[in-house]
Amino acid sequence: MKHTGFPAALIGLMIAACSPASEDSTGAPAPSADATDTSHTESMTSVAINEADLRHRISTLADDGFEGRSPATPGGIAASQWIADEMARIGLAPGYGDSYFQPVSLLAVTLEADQSSFDVAFEGEPLGLSMGEDVVYWSKLNSSEISVTDSELVFVGYGVVAPEYGWDDYAGLDVEGRTVVMLVNDPGYANPDSGLFNGNAMTYYGRWTYKYEEAARQGAAGVILIHQTAPASYGWNVVSGSWSGTQLDLAREPGQGTFSDIESWVTEDRARQMFDLAGLDFDAVTAAAARPGFEAVPMTGLTASGTLVNSTDTMESRNVVGIVPGTTRPDEYVLYTAHWDHLGSREVAEGEDGIYNGAVDNATGTAAILEIGEAFVGEPAERSVMILAVTAEESGLLGSAYYGENPIVPYEQTAGGINIDAILPSGRSRDVVVVGHGASELEDILTEAATEQDRYIVADPTPEAGYFYRSDHISLAKHGVPMLYADGGFDLREGGSEAGMAAGEDYRANRYHGPADEYSADWDMSGMVEDTTLFFTVGSRLANSDAWPNWYEGNEFRALRDAQMGTE
């Protein structure tokens, strides 16, 4: 998920003779000559970062021939094959043994809504929660039928266990077989000036993904997450739209992964009703949940029951991995990530456009990491550089999550990484926005490189929305690897902040996650070239140094990195 509410742009020498990456013959579609930038051919790309190369790669990836690059579809297979072929052509070594492909198995789970039910009852009387209107529920278990019966409800505040903040909402609590009810975001959001957590800036503990993970670790049978628009940073329409229909997850062997039986969201209105029935003052109890010393509260008389009938299917996709070997320390790595997938295509009326090309999101990022990879081939660094184009970001960061669980390079040999996700073609900016500002020492390298471009660093303007936790770098951060997530800013050199904000809003309102997100020859590529150069410079300095950046003191991932590197 991109931070499209942001203004403007927020939102090998040793393998010269390697063979092409054409490892399969799928009969999948190929880019159409009339839609790609045919003024610039693949054989003309240069090790110098430049506009023509970026245009060629973006226009190719965003072409109708790839049908929106949805994973495990003919278009997605063809797009990932093109990326692998491009890596081979420009001189990157295969990153997964002798292959450019790291296989990623995906599990598609479709809730059979007409055969499924989930409700909360008070003293045996169902509340009558309506799917989509009041509640959205699902299960990630690879099972055709999942049942929970008369599971007692308990309010666990924010559902957080954060030792570095001295916080444990599950302290002394046994939730085995029970259904936990919790708030979105973290205590710092409710008390931005209290010094709790990271104040108004969301931490990983505020993300819904963490909350479901922690509840499962605690043994909860069910999870009910209370939706509130401000702390979630999106309305109920996003919840009801995003968690209905087929859901994708990583396909795991039996016993792998930990999930509660049923996960759900409920509207605030219905949550207030539940609290009232349990004799609890919603405002008072939720306020107490944001203060140190909070203890979980049983929701007396309330139980949850449900039977979910699922149909499941396993699909195969792949991450695409290329490496530029290091000249003196090839076992140490700097990582670049971008997701290659988008939303595919939809059936529409004749004459309408049903292909979601994803030109900005994220043909731009994929093109940028290929451009950076080619630049490193021309200028190899002391450390190796890995170019990782991941699948299924739009389905929940699944490709990067798979890499996170199955790293090709040990984390203690990965010095750090840079994620590129959606670069708006709105021109050069005076600023660079760091999403999740104040996270890691990679920002020190970025600040120096940006200053040399006569640019300044600004913090993410809406830290409470937790955008740092919504793109692929988080899958590496969760395993301790310092990751940088930055974008060109909104203070444009032509038009200033007003023009930058207008460009960002125009994209968010008219093209983001829609069929209108298409490449245009009219794009102003100057900012994209500058940003890509900046990200190359940051990675090059790290790859040519002996530095091992860490997360800043107090960051939720610092302890992981310290343990990894033996610096506890």
What are these regions (language model features)?
Residues 50, 131-254, 259, 325, ...:
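Extracellular/luminal Protease-associated
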Residues 370, 374, 378, 383, ...:
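His/Asp/Glu-rich mid-to-C-terminal helical/loop segments that flank catalytic regions of hydrolases
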Residues 48-95, 110-112, 121-123, 174, ...:
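Catalytic-core environment of secreted peptidases
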Residues 19-22:
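Bacterial signal peptide processing site
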Residues 15-17:
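C-terminal motif of bacterial Sec signal peptides marking the signal peptidase cleavage site
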Residues 113, 121-123, 135-172, 254-358, ...:
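Soluble metallo-hydrolase cores and metallopeptidase-like ectodomains found primarily
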Residues 130-134, 145-146, 171, 177, ...:
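Metal-dependent peptidase/peptidase-like ectodomains
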Residues 44, 67-193, 298-300, 312, ...:
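Noncatalytic luminal/extracellular "stalk/propeptide" segments of secretory-pathway proteins
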